[in-house]
């Protein structure tokens, strides 16, 4: 990832470092408009996800997470910026005339070829079932349900590791540190997701954050008692309770939010590291 550092010509450009990947203006059947609504509200108009709203209009790029063009080689034509995710995407032209977007694997360049299938080479960008991937291989875009498409390790710089195989399942170490059992028939893509330096970005000003559709975060102690359990008091007062709470009065910071009895508890061999 190329980071563009701004000169300190104004206060808003001081320490500003943004992604310099070129923004294309594609027009094909893989791109369509989307109606974004809600602004973090539910059907009743109540805020359920805070600090959301506004932002620039976006066109959605349809990404091929299934990689079901089996045994047909494709060539990387472009590497593009996607406003809907922090990873880059690649436009692939397959030999049969099909065009699809995929997540950009780290190290992939324009002109490289990729392929999907069961007996394809273990090469960066190729997709194949876990049963045909050697142990210790770095993978991403991992399926959980066969045929549904990749759902795990899709963020920028994300990478998982295939650590063992036993019976019909394979143990995969996910980016969070969780070790999970996945069917060996599920597919995954070899390599790491590109744009690994995304955490080095510094927007530098509040307006750039608003372009992304993220609104300001207000501390609970700065609110009134009617708005937050931490609110109220004379002057700069503490939260006024033993433990912090959410705006709805539930315990916060350190409380487990995962359901105690979930259908896939037996598939998780080790919980994620905090």
Curated annotation (Swiss-Prot):
InterPro entries attached to this UniProt entry: NA-bd_OB-fold (IPR012340), Rib_uL2_dom2 (IPR014722), Ribosomal_uL2 (IPR002171), Ribosomal_uL2_bac/org-type (IPR005880), Ribosomal_uL2_C (IPR022669), Ribosomal_uL2_CS (IPR022671), Ribosomal_uL2_dom3 (IPR014726), Ribosomal_uL2_RNA-bd_dom (IPR022666)
Location of region: Disordered: 1-33, 223-265
Record's subcellular location: Plastid, Chloroplast
GO CC terms in record: chloroplast; mitochondrial large ribosomal subunit
GO biological process, any: mitochondrial translation
GO molecular function: rRNA binding; structural constituent of ribosome; transferase activity
Pfam families assigned: Ribosomal_L2, Ribosomal_L2_C
Keyword Cell cycle recorded: no
Family, as annotated: Belongs to the universal ribosomal protein uL2 family.
Subunit structure of this chain's protein: Part of the 50S ribosomal subunit.
Protein name in the entry: Large ribosomal subunit protein uL2cz/uL2cy
Natural source organism: Pelargonium hortorum (Common geranium)
Lineage: Eukaryota, Viridiplantae, Streptophyta, Embryophyta, Tracheophyta
Gene: rpl2-A
């Amino acid at each position: 990832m190329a980071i563009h550092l701004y000169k300190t010509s104004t206060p808003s450009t001081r320490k500003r470092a943004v992604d310099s990947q070129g923004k294309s203006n594609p027009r094909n059947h893989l791109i369509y408009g989307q109606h974004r609504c809600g602004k973090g509200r539910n059907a009743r108009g109540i805020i359920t996800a805070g600090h959301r709203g506004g932002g620039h209009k976006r066109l959605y790029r349809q990404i091929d997470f299934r990689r079901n063009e089996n045994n047909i080689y494709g060539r990387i034509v472009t590497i593009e910026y996607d406003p809907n995710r922090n990873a880059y995407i690649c436009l692939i032209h397959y030999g049969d005339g099909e065009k699809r977007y995929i997540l950009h694997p780290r190290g992939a360049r324009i002109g490289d070829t990729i392929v999907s299938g069961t007996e394809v080479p273990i090469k960066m960008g190729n997709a194949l079932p876990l049963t045909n991937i050697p142990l210790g291989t770095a993978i991403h875009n991992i399926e959980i349900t066969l045929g549904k498409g990749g759902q795990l390790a899709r963020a920028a710089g994300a990478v998982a590791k295939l650590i063992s195989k036993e019976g019909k399942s394979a143990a995969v170490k996910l980016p969070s540190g969780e070790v999970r059992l996945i069917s060996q028939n599920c597919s995954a893509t070899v390599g790491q997701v590109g744009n690994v330096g995304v955490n080095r970005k510094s927007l530098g000003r509040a307006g750039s954050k608003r372009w992304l559709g993220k609104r300001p975060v207000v501390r609970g102690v700065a609110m009134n008692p009617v708005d937050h359990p931490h609110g109220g008091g004379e002057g700069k007062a503490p939260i006024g309770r033993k433990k912090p709470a959410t705006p709805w009065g539930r315990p916060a910071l350190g409380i487990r939010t995962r359901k105690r009895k979930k259908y896939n508890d037996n598939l998780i061999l080790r919980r994620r590291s905090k």
